[in-house]
């Protein structure tokens, strides 16, 4: 019995030891297993589907199972914001390929080729004369050809004040042509332009209403394989230009060790431009896939023989199979859906051999800039032609037009007083191919104002031709102010017919006096050209907008400003007006209140700043915004005011710089330059002039660019301010006074006040100014 109990006891101890050992070993194994964290899970039996029908699941921590219940989706990367498409800048002239003989022995220290910049805007630089010809729109298009404008120029967004008016968004589907391929597209049609009733009643609108952007905006394109292929082929041709091939073949005739030095001595940067377009691919192992069969065979051995980057790039380019560049980058594909094509001159090949670009061209027929210029040339010019090009400097001076024949018929006008040597020439212009319903011939009289005989007889000649009903299409007056900047032209311009198709005035480079234009105020002119052979961009060029109220088109197409012209050469071009000027006749001295006194001037400001601000001539130096016909606040405008011919105006008091008729234009215009009349050392102002001067409110301050300035007609001769009145200045008045001293550099911190106004004198002295008192006897220190 004892034996049985003892045996039972031993078995119990043995079984217990085995159980404890098993538990300990299992725990140790579980704890040391690398997969233990993921080997435990809780699953519930429910009515959900067994499988998740998605292709972005994370299988890294998956368990064997008949269900996808515990699988997580891989988060999708956030798409990078797509940059705004930039209109194609007008291409720079292709540099003349360098001659090998000239570059082998350079006289000038080599320059490191510059990396091409990504082309934007605008800028705000003037737009050079375009080069590519405009194409004819397809018959199916409902609108005249044209895409979005260049430059937008970078215009500040309006401050959110009143809610902008909603412009109707009219879209329709149509067939358009892109790169020779007809595709379906959705196009937004521009709505009509709203004209305020005030502008109509006060003769501020263009007699022949002007539309800046008459083409639609492409919203979406149905991209086809045919379109992709045509787009790729367009860029291929530019990547494989004959001049590229010719220059690089010549480069490879040199010894490999000479190539790098030769390229560095290329002052035109021609090779650097070629390298830049392919460098991403050339630095990628992917390049072998885009070589010719011969290139693929030789490349492995050549890799160790390249002695410089230039040697490598030249060899790779020579062995490229350009027909393999058929795919567009994701960016190019995205822009193509919006109707933009990679601009061939700005295109490059990425590391994957796909075509991308720094600039994209709008579809044919949807370039708002070229369409505007073409429409102006055809419908606004008196001697119109079908092209978007402006006239060259030579044709501008000579009065030539594409598609027109010019014949000298001066002898036929001898009977009216014209004689040889008086600087007066008469030409007959005849259209080479007649157009029904349009002007096909006309007579133009050229007058040289620098010729004393011609200048003296001009007025009489115009009067005689008017009396005899001789139909003259246009007058062109040259060298205005060349011999004498104060030369009088008001009487000559007043004598012109009240209705005149064409008037072109050429101002001397040394004279910026345009005050005679006020004589055109009541004349109806179809085309007015204001030109110079000097610097057309100077701030001194000013114009009185009230003189242009009845002009249908001020020529803005004949713009010939470019760094490519020889410095100092006489280049005829239209003038850019960034300053508005007014005359004493614009100020109503007989009115009883300031608003009525300034009505003509404020109407002139409104005409330029808002009503006709969609016209290029009234956009100052920087051009249109994104929607020039409907969002005028986004357009540029003249930033200078010249009151040197209006002595009554002493500050900006009473002047209106906001759009009082259209609440969506909720950003006031601001100034960078103001010129006031003065003829002594002391500039006189009233208390009201200073309290309501608006200098802080309407003058640009603290922004990039040249500092704003206030000047006087007598230059630095103005050194003091005299404040007339028997009151103190308000807080605004003190602030405006401080701004005036800040912007007017000729002023010293000396202020003259009436000797009876001690409170004002003390107020100014406490503000840190030197104060002098005046009586009828003169100045006395106090």
Swiss-Prot record:
Entry membrane topology: Single-pass membrane protein
Region span, Disordered: 57-171
Entry's transmembrane regions: 10-30
Cross-referenced InterPro entries: Mycoplas_M_dom, Predic_Ig_block
Cellular component aspect of the GO annotation: membrane
Biased composition (Pro residues): 77-97, 125-135
Compartments it resides in: Membrane
Top-level taxonomic group: Bacteria
Keyword S-adenosyl-L-methionine: no
Composition bias type Basic and acidic residues, residue spans: 57-76, 98-124
The keyword Transmembrane helix is assigned to this record: yes
Keywords: Membrane, Transmembrane, Transmembrane helix
Family the entry assigns: To U.parvum UU046.
Protein name, as recorded: Uncharacterized protein UU044
């Amino acid at each position: 019995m004892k034996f049985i109990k003892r045996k039972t006891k031993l078995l119990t101890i043995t079984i217990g030891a085995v159980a404890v050992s098993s538990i300990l070993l299992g725990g140790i194994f579980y704890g040391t297993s690398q997969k233990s964290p993921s080997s435990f899970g809780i699953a519930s039996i429910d009515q959900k589907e067994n499988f998740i029908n998605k292709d972005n699941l994370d299988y890294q921590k998956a368990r064997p199972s008949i269900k996808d219940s515990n699988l997580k989706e891989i988060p999708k990367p956030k798409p990078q914001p797509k940059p705004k498409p930039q209109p194609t800048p007008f291409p720079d002239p292709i540099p003349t390929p360098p001659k090998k003989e000239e570059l082998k022995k350079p006289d000038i220290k080599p320059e490191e080729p510059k990396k091409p910049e990504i082309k934007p805007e605008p800028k705000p630089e003037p737009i050079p004369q375009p080069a590519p010809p405009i194409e004819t729109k397809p018959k199916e298009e409902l609108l005249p050809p044209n895409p979005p404008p260049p430059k937008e120029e970078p215009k500040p967004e309006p401050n959110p004040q009143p809610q902008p008016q909603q412009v109707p968004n009219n879209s329709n589907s149509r067939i358009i042509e892109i790169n020779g391929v007809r595709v379906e597209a959705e196009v937004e049609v521009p709505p009509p332009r709203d004209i305020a009733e005030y502008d109509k009643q006060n003769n501020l609108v263009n007699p022949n209403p002007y539309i800046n952007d008459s083409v639609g905006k492409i919203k979406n394109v149905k991209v086809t394989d045919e379109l992709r292929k045509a787009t790729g082929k367009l860029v291929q041709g530019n990547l494989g230009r004959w001049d590229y091939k010719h220059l690089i073949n010549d480069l490879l005739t040199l010894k490999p060790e000479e190539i790098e030095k030769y390229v560095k001595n290329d002052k035109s940067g021609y090779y650097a431009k070629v390298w830049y377009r392919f460098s991403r691919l050339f630095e990628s192992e992917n390049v072998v896939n885009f070589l010719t069969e011969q290139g693929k065979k030789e490349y492995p051995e050549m890799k160790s023989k390249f002695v410089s980057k230039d040697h490598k790039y030249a060899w790779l380019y020579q062995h490229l199979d350009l027909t393999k560049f058929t795919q567009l980058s994701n960016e190019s594909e995205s822009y193509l859906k919006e109707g933009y094509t990679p601009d061939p001159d700005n295109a490059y090949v990425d590391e994957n051999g796909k075509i991308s670009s720094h600039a994209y061209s709008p579809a044919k027929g949807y370039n708002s800039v070229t369409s505007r210029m073409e429409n102006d040339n055809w419908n606004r010019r008196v001697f119109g032609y079908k092209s978007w090009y402006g006239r060259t400097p030579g044709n501008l001076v000579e009065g030539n037009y594409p598609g027109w024949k010019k014949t000298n018929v001066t002898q036929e006008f001898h009977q009216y007083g014209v004689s040889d040597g008086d600087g007066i020439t008469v030409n007959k212009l005849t259209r080479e191919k007649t157009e029904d319903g349009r002007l096909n011939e006309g007579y133009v009289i050229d007058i040289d104002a620098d010729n004393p005989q011609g200048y003296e007889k001009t007025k009489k000649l115009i009067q005689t031709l008017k009396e005899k009903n001789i139909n003259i299409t246009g007058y062109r007056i040259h060298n205005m102010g060349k011999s004498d900047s104060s030369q009088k032209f008001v009487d000559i311009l007043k004598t012109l017919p009240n209705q005149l198709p064409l008037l072109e005035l050429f101002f001397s480079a040394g004279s910026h006096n345009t005050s005679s234009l006020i004589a055109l105020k009541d004349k109806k002119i179809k085309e007015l050209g204001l030109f110079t052979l000097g610097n057309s961009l100077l701030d001194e060029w000013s114009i009185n907008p009230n003189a242009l109220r009845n002009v249908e088109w001020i020529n803005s197409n004949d713009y010939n400003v470019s760094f490519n012209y020889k410095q100092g050469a006489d280049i005829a071009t239209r003038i850019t007006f960034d300053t508005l000027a007014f005359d004493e006749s614009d100020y109503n001295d007989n009115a009883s209140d300031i608003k009525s006194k300034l009505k003509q001037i404020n109407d002139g400001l409104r005409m330029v700043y808002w009503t006709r601000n969609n016209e290029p001539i009234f956009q100052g130096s920087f051009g249109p915004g994104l929607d020039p016909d409907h969002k005028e606040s986004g357009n540029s405008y003249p930033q200078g005011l010249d009151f040197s011919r209006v002595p009554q105006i002493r500050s900006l008091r009473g002047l209106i710089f906001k759009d009082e008729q259209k609440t969506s234009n909720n950003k006031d215009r601001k100034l960078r330059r103001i010129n006031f009349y003065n003829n002594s050392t002391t500039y006189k102002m009233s208390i009201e002039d200073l309290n309501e001067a608006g200098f802080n409110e309407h003058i640009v301050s603290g922004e990039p660019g040249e500092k704003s300035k206030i000047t006087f007609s007598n230059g630095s001769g103005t050194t003091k301010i005299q404040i007339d009145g028997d009151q103190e200045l308000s807080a605004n008045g003190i602030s405006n006074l401080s701004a005036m001293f800040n912007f007017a550099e000729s002023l010293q911190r000396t202020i003259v006040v009436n000797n009876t106004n001690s409170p004002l004198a003390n107020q100014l002295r406490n503000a840190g100014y030197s104060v002098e008192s005046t009586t009828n006897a003169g100045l006395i220190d106090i």
